[in-house]
Amino acid sequence: MKLSIKTLSGAIMTSMTLVTQSAFSQTIGPLAQEHVVVYESPDPASIYCYTPGIARLNSGRLVATMDRGGRGVKKGDPAGKVFTSDDGGRSWTHRAGFPFVHARPFVAGRSLYVLGQARDLMVIRSDDNGVTWSAPAKLTEDQSWHQSACNVHYANGCVYLVMERRVTGDIKSWGVGEMAPVLMRGKLGADLTRRENWTFASELSFRNTIPNVEKDPAIDFFGVPFFPAPYPRGSLPAPRRNSAPIGWLETNVVQFKDPDHMWFDPKGKTFHLWARAHTGGTGYAAIAKVVEHDDGSMTTTLETVPSGKKILFVPCPGGQMRFHVLYDEPTRLFWLLSSQATDSMTRADRLDADRFNLPNNERHRLQLHFSKNMVDWCFAGLVAMGATPKESRHYASMAVDGGDLVVLSRSGDARAKSAHDGNLITFHRVKNFRSLVY
């Protein structure tokens, strides 16, 4: 039988239409909507759940950390909590409390650590896989630090992580404009509860990155800041909705291993800091670089592009909120867990009451991307989402568990006080995450 080009073309178009209709008739849902509650607030109106952190031990044990805030937390009751799971996250055992916040768990040598801040940096150590813990040890004196449970990086026989110091204390609003992300390095076999076993990079405060940032930042053409954000108090785009002076916070550390990458260092002595960009807009992260010197010291500066121009902001889906970066060696890809913005252009004075603060501050859709270079991102899927903007799924941490990603989320349900002040810490599992690569 002979088929004309016209007949063949019509048959192909009909087939494509049927395939398309079939594809769109299927509901595309989140990758890991089902969850296990690791911690639930006993009083959602006065006790809030923050800073989920997760690590996997070589034994397969999962370690989770979180902290609590709000007027309902009794004085003297440790804000932080450690949990472990030996059944893949289906059930959790409370192991210890600790008197600091903004912490994350990590392994170094044969020990497990949790490092955070109670203004000063503090750390605890376990030598039995999280069952028992040392007394808290201070790493600084009379300083003011900040962070979230961002990533850790291993290289050169050391562990690297970032904490952020508030260096001036003169912003009378949210102080991210005066924060300096500080890369910290510790030897894997050393006792990391001792200050002398850590090396701190030099400090670069955000207020020292953009000329005239305090009055009229010398930066234009892509809307930074989005709302007026003058020092020292910022502005109110609408009642009870604050636009603090622009800044960076909640910083991850990455290292480029691809020799073709523009910022690859064959000596392995250059690290890059990827931070949440508080600008009032969406879709950008703020970055800096840290270079290790032969004497072991580390210097923090801005990165440059081939034109010689400095680069401070890069494309990053969800970069306006806390995000988590994980490098996966088998795929040689960076994985990004972040908050998806869907409605950042609604006027601040017309936002629904259950929307938290500024229009770019959506917190109820947790998304996953992958990238070969930390700039060009491919969407892998929604991880989980709340039923309403108040029911958050955000500030999540992740770790690799075999072929899966395990995720710990700062979450809320209908009882939560707000999208920011949630009442749950939830565990999620993205199965066979490497199959999402295309």
Annotated model-derived regions:
Residues 1-6:
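Positively charged n-region of N-terminal signal peptides that target proteins for export
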Residues 7-9, 80:
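Intrinsically disordered, low-complexity Ser/Thr- and Pro-rich stretches
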Residues 24-148, 153-250, 254-317, 328-333, ...:
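Beta-rich carbohydrate-recognition and catalytic domains
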Residues 325:
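Catalytic cores of secreted/periplasmic lytic hydrolases that degrade extracellular macromolecules
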